[in-house]
Amino acid sequence: MRVKRAVHAKKKRKKYLKAAKGYRGALSRRYKLAKQMYVRSKWYSYVGRKLKKRDMRKLWITRINIAARNEGLKYSEFIHGLKLAGVSINRKMLSELAVNDPEAFREYVKIAKEALAS
């Protein structure tokens, strides 16, 4: 018996062409190219999710560094002072405090300076 798969094949092609709808030129009209670009786009989104974590951490560290330097400490000294003081607060929260609540951030800087002095 011969295998008839027109329905399945059409459904599969339609899925890829629908996903490639916004692509330019032949990439949105030709099945083979649309499928290649679809796979590539999924790879880019996967990699992007990994890079996002690095980028956010860099942003938090930059914000903390700027705020700490305004108070007279380098970023590394500030983090070391917090570790010596036994304060466990993550960089995301510290950067939020540095941006939105400078008074609370100054308290952490004060704690770090006291720990470094002793």
Swiss-Prot record:
Protein purpose: Binds directly to 23S ribosomal RNA and is necessary for the in vitro assembly process of the 50S ribosomal subunit. It is not involved in the protein synthesizing functions of that subunit.
Gene field: rplT
Family assignment from sequence similarity: Belongs to the bacterial ribosomal protein bL20 family.
Gene Ontology MF terms in the entry: rRNA binding; structural constituent of ribosome
Species in which this protein is naturally found: Thermotoga petrophila (strain ATCC BAA-488 / DSM 13995 / JCM 10881 / RKU-1)
Pfam families: Ribosomal_L20
HAMAP family, per the entry: Ribosomal_bL20 (MF_00382)
BP GO annotations: ribosomal large subunit assembly; translation
Protein name: Large ribosomal subunit protein bL20
